[in-house]
């Protein structure tokens, strides 16, 4: 098949590009390189330096006639911009850009549209949380949606537009709601705290963990995400699916896993660690994906951290410390400041 992947120079997109090529598909990558890396793109793919908001994208689809479009292009908050400008950027990329891609799919008679969405920031807190003090909540794809951040709001809106194009124009789709994705990557592409912790500890520097959040999140290894995307090339028609580990871990858990794997005694610097009166551990139920196409995550947090550390050391020429056993009893959750 011929597959067009938007955002193919980013962390998830570059891994998918390689996997599609390894599976024998013809792949074209569309990316602005604003946040992605040209070096991350597999040289076997054809690269188009293009913004998804550009009208030329529709001409490209008309010319290339991809069978499948895998939409992984997304905005990223920029520290130099005020909050309202970042919110406008999210809307511009995730709504206007998405509509441009969807229109191009319809005009080019694309057979399927795969939409990379989110999950951890989408769902409404149940009322029982406030009464119980702490709730470990497993949510499925039908749970009430209540996104609070502009990024998540625009992604939820994007899902609505994808479904609209299916109803209105018959464009088949699969929506994948990812947990927080981690894996081996270039540092400049890193957005997950695991990569931050690994790089800081290997450089014998003290990581900074700041914030006042107390909820755990679901984390999924990039290898498991790639396998799910390969599955939905031919399955999961018009479904919305969690691609998740089915487990929740707080940021302190992540740090302890990395520190133990690296045999490091360095402690993080906690800035303003204020916990609220309630503590939620959100877990994304992945039963629907398991049933739809037999997918299941293969790496838990311990195995995933070990794999990422090994790959990171290989990439940067560091020696792996002796093997250690991961163990954590921490129940605190802090936000990483340097993401």
Question: What is each PLM-predicted segment?
Answer:
Residues 105, 166, 201, 232, ...:
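Hydrophobic pocket-lining residues that define ligand/cofactor binding sites across diverse proteins
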Residues 31, 177-180, 272:
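Residue-level recognition of beta-strand->loop/alpha-helix junctions
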Residues 204-339:
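C-terminal substrate-binding subdomain of Rossmann-fold SDR/epimerase-dehydratase oxidoreductases
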Residues 50, 61, 82, 90, ...:
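Pocket-edge positions in alpha/beta enzyme catalytic cores
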Residues 1-174, 339:
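N-terminal Rossmann-like NAD(P)+-binding domain of SDR-like oxidoreductases, especially those catalyzing
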Residues 127-134, 152, 160-217, 222-226, ...:
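NAD(P)-dependent short-chain dehydrogenase/reductase
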Residues 36-38, 123-125, 185, 251, ...:
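A short beta-to-alpha transition loop/helix N-cap that caps and shapes the active-site region
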Residues 9-12, 38, 120, 185, ...:
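Gly/Ser/Thr-rich beta-alpha loop segments that engage phosphate groups in nucleotides
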């Amino acid at each position: 098949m011929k597959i067009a992947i938007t955002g193919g120079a980013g962390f998830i997109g570059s891994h998918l590009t390689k996997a599609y090529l390894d599976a024998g598909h013809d792949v074209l990558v569309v990316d602005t390189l604003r946040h992605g890396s040209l070096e991350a793109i597999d040289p076997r793919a054809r690269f188009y330096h293009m913004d998804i908001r550009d009208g030329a994208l529709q001409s490209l689809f008309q010319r290339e006639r991809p069978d499948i479009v895998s939409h992984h292009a997304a905005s990223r908050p920029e520290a130099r911009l005020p909050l309202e400008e970042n919110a406008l950027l999210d809307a511009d990329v995730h709504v206007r850009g998405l509509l441009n891609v969807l229109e191009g799919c319809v005009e080019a008679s694309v057979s399927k549209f795969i939409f990379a969405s989110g999950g951890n920031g989408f769902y409404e807190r149940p009322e029982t949380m406030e009464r119980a003090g702490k709730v470990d909540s497993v949510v499925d794809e039908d749970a009430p949606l209540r996104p609070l951040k502009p990024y998540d709001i625009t992604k939820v809106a994007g899902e609505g537009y994808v479904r609209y194009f299916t109803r209105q124009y018959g464009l088949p789709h699969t929506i994948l709601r990812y947990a927080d994705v981690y894996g081996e990557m270039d540092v400049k592409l890193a957005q997950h705290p695991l990569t931050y912790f690994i790089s800081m500890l290997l450089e014998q520097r003290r990581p900074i963990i700041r914030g006042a959040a107390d909820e755990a999140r679901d984390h999924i290894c990039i290898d498991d995400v790639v396998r799910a995307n390969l599955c939905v090339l031919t399955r999961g028609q018009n479904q919305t699916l969690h691609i998740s580990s089915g487990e929740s871990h707080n940021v302190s858990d992540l740090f302890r896993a990395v520190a133990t794997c690296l045999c490091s005694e360095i402690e993080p610097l906690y800035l303003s660690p204020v916990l609220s009166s309630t503590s939620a551990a959100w877990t994304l139920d992945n039963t629907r994906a398991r049933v739809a196409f037999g997918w299941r995550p293969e790496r838990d947090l311990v195995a995933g951290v070990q794999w990422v550390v090994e790959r990171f050391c290989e990439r940067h020429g560091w020696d792996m410390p002796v093997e250690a056993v991961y163990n954590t009893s921490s129940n605190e959750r802090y936000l990483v400041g340097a993401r």
